[in-house]
Amino acid sequence: MEHEDDDENDDENECKFHFLAKPLEFESMKIGPYQIHLLETGRFWLDGGAMFGVVPKTLWSQEKPSDEKNRIEMSMKVLLILYEDRKILVDAGAGHKFPPKLQEIYGLDYQRFSLKTSLQAHRLQPVDITDVILTHCHFDHVGGATERDGEVLQLTFPKATHYVQDSHWNWALSPSEKDRASFLKENLEPLKQSGRLKILLGERELFPGLHLLLSNGHTVGLQMVKIQDSTNTLFYCSDLMPTAAHVPLPYIMGYDLYPLTTLEEKRRYLSQACDENWLIVLEHDAEVDAIRIEQGEKRLEIREKLAI
C-alpha cells in the first residue's frame, strides 16, 4: 500500500465531444488525449424509499417506478478511459462474489451485462487494465475489483494500481453501524494485501486534465472524477447524484451518512455544472447515461439527456 502526496499538473489538451443521436447507447467520446467509454457491469435492485430518503413515494415513483418489493432498477456503469499506454477504469461494479441469497435480495442481473464482457467488446482483458480509480468502497463500486479463483480471493486487475482516498480507506476498514453492511471484507482484504493500492491525500489532478474531487456526504472521502479541457467537461459524480431523478437538491439517499453535507455539495457542484455546461455521467441510472442541467424558474432542471 502506497501513500502519495498531492501534486499539480498544468498540461492542457485540445479535445472535442462526439455525441450520438440516439439515447441510451454505450459508445464513446473524446476529451483531449482521452478516449472515454461508458461500460455496463450489471444491474441490481434497491429499495426505492432508501434511494430517495425523505421524498414521498408519490413523487419519486413518477420517475422511478418500483417493483412489487418496492425496489427500483439500478445500473452499475463505469468509465473506461484510454490514454497513451494507460487503460483506466473508474469504479468496478459489484463483481460476482455474492452468495445466492444476496443475489436474490439485490436482484443482481449479469445476463445482459458484466464488466468482463464489456471489456471484451473493446478487445481488452482484465490484465490489460493499468489503473482503477475507486470512487469509494461500497460493494456496488468496488466488488468487481476482486474475484474468487476457487477459494482464493484475488485482484481482478492484477497489474493495475488502485486509487482510494486516505480518509475513505480508513473509514471503510472501520465503518459505522449505519453503513458497515456496505463494506464487505472480501472486497477490501485482497486490495489491502495486494501491494497495488495507492492511498491518495485529497483532491488532485491525477493525470493531465483528469481531476479527483472530494465529497463527504454520502460517505467519508468519496472521490468523483472530472475530465476537462478548454472547451468541455465530463463529471462522473458517483453517489453524489446516482440517477437523473436525484437532480432536485432535497432528493438525497437515505443511505447517506451526512445528508446536509450532501445537500450543500449538490448545490455547489450542480451550480457549477449548470454554469459551465458539464456533462454529468450517472453511474446508477438504468435508463439515462448522462445529462446536462439548467436553471429553471424554481430549481435546477434537466436540459437534455444524452448518450455517450
Where are these regions (language model features)?
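Cap/insert and terminal regions of metallo-dependent hydrolase folds
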Residues: 106-117, 230-308
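Metallo-beta-lactamase
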Residues: 110-124, 128-140, 156-214, 264-277
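Active-site metal-binding loops of divalent metal-dependent hydrolases
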Residues: 41-43, 92-95, 137, 167-168, ...
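Metal-dependent catalytic neighborhoods of phosphoester/phosphodiester hydrolases
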Residues: 142-152, 292-294
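Intrinsic disorder/low-complexity segments
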Residues: 1-27
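Conserved beta-strand hairpin/beta-sheet module of binuclear metal-dependent hydrolase folds
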Residues: 31-35, 42-122, 224-239
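Residue-level marker for buried hydrophobic side chains located in beta-strands
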Residues: 88-90, 133, 162, 234-236, ...
